């Protein structure tokens, strides 16, 4: 992973968890070839462990094949919530939790 290729290492992305793609606004240029071109997604794997889906891949410079960052995305269902996480030097860090119920109990207003 290369901190010289990104504007900010592991930026806080709130609840934006990317299963695929790249956060190009954070990409400065490749530190090895000094070009700012497309970022390839390579070495993508998808595994499932104990009900948790884990997707990993590398962000790579199109021109010189320098590895810019390693991306990890996880998805799981815990109780009545879908849990998402993302950790990547380029795309950032994020967490999200979405209720599987029609009405999210956390969003309901108290009656009294």
Curated annotation (Swiss-Prot):
Binding site for Zn(2+) 2: 30, 33, 61, 64
GO biological process, one term: positive regulation of DNA-templated transcription
Keyword Transcription regulation: yes
Alphabetical keyword list: Activator, Developmental protein, Metal-binding, Transcription, Transcription regulation, Zinc
Binding site for Zn(2+) 1: 2, 5, 30, 66
A UniProt-annotated Pfam family: Churchill
Reported function: Transcriptional activator that mediates FGF signaling during neural development. Plays a role in the regulation of cell movement. Does not bind DNA by itself.
Protein name: Protein Churchill
Provenance organism: Xenopus tropicalis
Gene: churc1
